[in-house]
Each structure stands twice: as C-alpha cells, then as structure tokens.
Amino acid sequence: MENKIKVVFCGTPKIGADVLKALIEMNEVEVVLVISQPDKPIGRKKQIVYTPVKKLALENNLKVVQPNKIGEIYDDLAKLEFDFLITCAFGQFIPTKILKLAKTDSINFHGSLLPKLRGGAPIQYAIKNGDKKTGITIMQMVKQMDAGDYYVQESIDILDSDDSGSLFEKMGQLAYSMCKKYLVDIYNHKFELIKQNENEVTFCKNISSEEEKIDWNNTSLDIFNLIRSLSPSPISYTTINSQRYKIKSSKIINLDNQNKNVAPGTIIDINRQGIVVKTLDSSLLILEIQKEGKKMILASNYYLNKLSDLKISDKFD
C-alpha cells in the first residue's frame, strides 16, 4: 500500500493496548496520535501508573495525549489528517464533531455481540448474566452509545472456568486478530454495514459498589456468576457483624437434605476445600477469601490453620 492508513487511536486498559499493538504491527497503518485516559494513582502508596495504552504507545515512540475530556483537544485533532478514529475501551464520550473528522470512518471495537450489552461493562455482564457466548463487534460510532451500524462480529465461548480477567484476555486476543484481519477491507469499503436490531437491544451500565455485594438469597449460580464477573477486580464481597470479606472465587455444590431449612448466608461447613455457605437453592464453596485489612487467602486455611474469625453456623448478612 503506497499511502498508509492514518489512524488516531483512543483506548485505556489492556484490551485497548491489544488493538493498538495490532495497529502498530500492520505495515499498512500509521498511528498518528494515541489518546488515553489520564493516569491515576494506584494502590495504597498512590503511585501514578501509566495506562496500558500509554505505556505501549511510548514504547513505540508514538505521540500520546491524555485530556480529561477529548473535546478539549478538538482544535488539535482538526489540524490532523487521518482516515480512521479507532477506539477500544477508551472510557470517554466522544462528541459527534470529533467523530466526523475521520476521512473514512470512526469505529469502535465493542466487547459484546451487539445489539446485546450496549454500555460500559459488557464483558463483566456477559459473565454475570451467565451467557455462554460473547464476542467483539467492529461498529460505526454515532452520537447514541453503541447504537451504530456494524461491519463485522466474531464470537468466543465463555467457559465456567472464566472470570472477567481471563475473558478480557481472550477478548483482547480476538480484538487484536480482528483488527489485523478486517481493517484494510473496511478502509477499502469491502463491507456492507449491518443495522442493529433495536428489538434485541440490552444494556449494561457500569457495576456499582452496591451491586458488588453478594445477596445470599440468590441462587448459587447467580452468586457464582457475580463472583466470576468481578474477579480479579474489584472483587465481590459479603459482610458479617459489619466486617467485610472479599470473595474472589467459588464453586457450586449441592446440599444434603438436612440443610434445606438453614437460612441463606449461613456457614454450614469449613473443610479442606474451603468454606461452605447456604444459598437460596443449594450451597456455594468459597475458595478464596480476604478479610478486610488482610491478604487474600485460600479459604481452606480456615480449616487447616484453625482460623477463628469465621465459624460454622455464623451467618453472612
């Protein structure tokens, strides 16, 4: 290709960096600017950590800007010549006047099979909902969030062993391969755009801190899926006597008949595998648990090391 495809890329977390990596590796593409969310302090020491997209961009000598709102740099973008504005997990609303600056199109790599799961947390919600499949949609960006026509979709399976960390990894690999496979054809207008079916639209707002709390009156499957969807971060939690415990992983097990009348949330066993808690319909084996102010540990430590802050018959709120 004589003239390279000029791209302005917007992204922030690791999945965004996966798409940027594909763009950097493509001989047909020149990344003229990278836009990422401002760096944030991380951890107890509040150290400023570069976003994964910024880190990759700097390693490849690309220009990076980090506006609080992308509208602040409209004038600078208007002076640039670029074919595509490409986003993946950027985390900011992009005004229509910026979308219109791209000569070919402004496109987004969205982490669901649209029209399902429009919104900011599609990967987490796919697990939380118990979906067996999800995927990446390469779509046109329009004013309404995730409502544009799309060029192409590819799907992957969600395994029972997946949590949001492993699914983000798989989705990043899928987005990477789709970028390499389809971008040049999109540039050369080889795709017919597909309209989303408005009758099948579902939404996924960002998960609130209240929704991170486990409700033991739900089924084991619902709780199991919630825990997976919030692992490895921010991690679901439960409380007992105002003490918070984070629960990172679990397993569904069936109850003996003798426990059918036990209230949901009650600890019914502590054994070599972990801590068994009654749910609405069966029971859940907690595998990894973290008491507030302590480190995450295997729940089996409560049996092996005779830890005393949780006991059989204690009841989580």
From Swiss-Prot:
In which residues is (6S)-5,6,7,8-tetrahydrofolate bound? 112-115
Cross-referenced Pfam families: Formyl_trans_C, Formyl_trans_N
Q: Name one GO molecular function term.
A: methionyl-tRNA formyltransferase activity
Q: Which InterPro entries match?
A: Fmt (IPR005794), Formyl_trans_C (IPR005793), Formyl_transf_N (IPR002376), Formyl_transf_N_sf (IPR036477), Formyl_transferase-like_C_sf (IPR011034), GART_AS (IPR001555), Met-tRNA-FMT_C (IPR044135), Met-tRNA-FMT_N (IPR041711)
Q: CDD domains recorded for this chain?
A: FMT_core_Met-tRNA-FMT_N (cd08646), Met_tRNA_FMT_C (cd08704)
Q: Does the keyword Cell membrane apply?
A: no
The chain's disulfide connectivity reads none
Q: Does the keyword RNA-binding apply?
A: no
> What GO CC annotations are associated with the protein?
cytosol
Reaction catalysed? L-methionyl-tRNA(fMet) + (6R)-10-formyltetrahydrofolate = N-formyl-L-methionyl-tRNA(fMet) + (6S)-5,6,7,8-tetrahydrofolate + H(+)
What EC class does the entry list? transferase
Keywords attached to this Swiss-Prot or TrEMBL record, sorted alphabetically, are: Protein biosynthesis, Transferase
Q: Which domain of life is it from?
A: Bacteria
- The protein's Enzyme Commission number: 2.1.2.9
Cited function: Attaches a formyl group to the free amino group of methionyl-tRNA(fMet). The formyl group appears to play a dual role in the initiator identity of N-formylmethionyl-tRNA by promoting its recognition by IF2 and preventing the misappropriation of this tRNA by the elongation apparatus.
Family matches, as NCBIfam families: fmt
User: What's this protein's family per the entry?
Assistant: Belongs to the Fmt family.
HAMAP family attached to this UniProt entry? Formyl_trans (MF_00182)
Name-wise, this protein is: Methionyl-tRNA formyltransferase
Give the species. Answer: Mycoplasma capricolum subsp. capricolum (strain California kid / ATCC 27343 / NCTC 10154)
Question: Where is the organism placed in the taxonomic lineage, from the top?
Answer: Bacteria, Bacillati, Mycoplasmatota, Mollicutes, Mycoplasmataceae
